């Protein structure tokens, strides 16, 4: 078992779901001494662009490694005011397969982001917390997959032996990222440089057949 921290300052979310576990809980303790997550992370524009590209490339590579397809990855630039550079994936619709393919894809973004922070010497407890808080949409989707496929709610109990607990899913995502980590980095740098990458380009860069 490992401890999770409840974050009472729920991030922006619809009123009816903002206190759901996939929004509230983080493995890193919450940070309250800054106006928002942007100030806690304190990235340069170049760091933020690459950080977001790594996050989305983690999703994309595990998804493609499982035999699924994406249409594109797009990195929207910062607007110079409030919005930071933010990458997103357009997934090819209609994918089917084992439930684990989809929850590992969901967890891979924040796990790739955290790994990149460690490997590049950028990791801080605050930045790790920000990575988790920004991943609530991914965690929500993982919850939906577990509910649909198994009729149970995704838990945040820190139970590394329970396949329905997010700690277990994060561990499996870490393991799945190990053999494809170089592909994740290669794709991330390409996204950060080119801003938009087609599914065909992503498959070529990572070596996965399309």
Model-flagged regions — what are they?
Residues 2-210:
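Soluble catalytic regions of large protease machineries
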């Amino acid at each position: 078992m490992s401890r999770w921290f409840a974050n009472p300052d729920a991030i922006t979310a619809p009123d009816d779901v903002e206190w759901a576990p996939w929004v509230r809980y983080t493995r890193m303790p919450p940070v309250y001494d800054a106006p928002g997550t942007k100030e806690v992370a304190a990235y340069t524009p170049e760091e933020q662009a690459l950080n977001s590209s790594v996050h989305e490339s983690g999703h994309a590579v595990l998804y493609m490694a499982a035999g699924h397809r994406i249409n594109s990855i797009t990195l929207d630039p910062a607007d110079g005011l409030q919005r930071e550079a933010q990458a997103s994936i357009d997934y090819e619709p209609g994918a089917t397969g084992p439930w684990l393919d989809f929850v590992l894809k969901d967890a891979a973004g924040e796990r790739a982001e955290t790994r990149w922070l460690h490997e590049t010497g950028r990791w801080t407890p605050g930045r790790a917390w920000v990575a988790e808080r920004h991943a609530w949409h991914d965690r929500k989707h993982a919850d939906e997959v577990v509910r649909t496929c198994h009729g149970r709610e995704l838990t945040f109990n820190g139970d590394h032996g329970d396949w329905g607990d997010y700690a277990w899913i994060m561990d499996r995502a870490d393991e799945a990222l190990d053999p494809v980590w170089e592909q994740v980095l290669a794709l991330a740098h390409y996204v950060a440089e080119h801003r938009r990458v087609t599914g065909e380009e992503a498959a070529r860069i990572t070596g996965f057949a399309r």
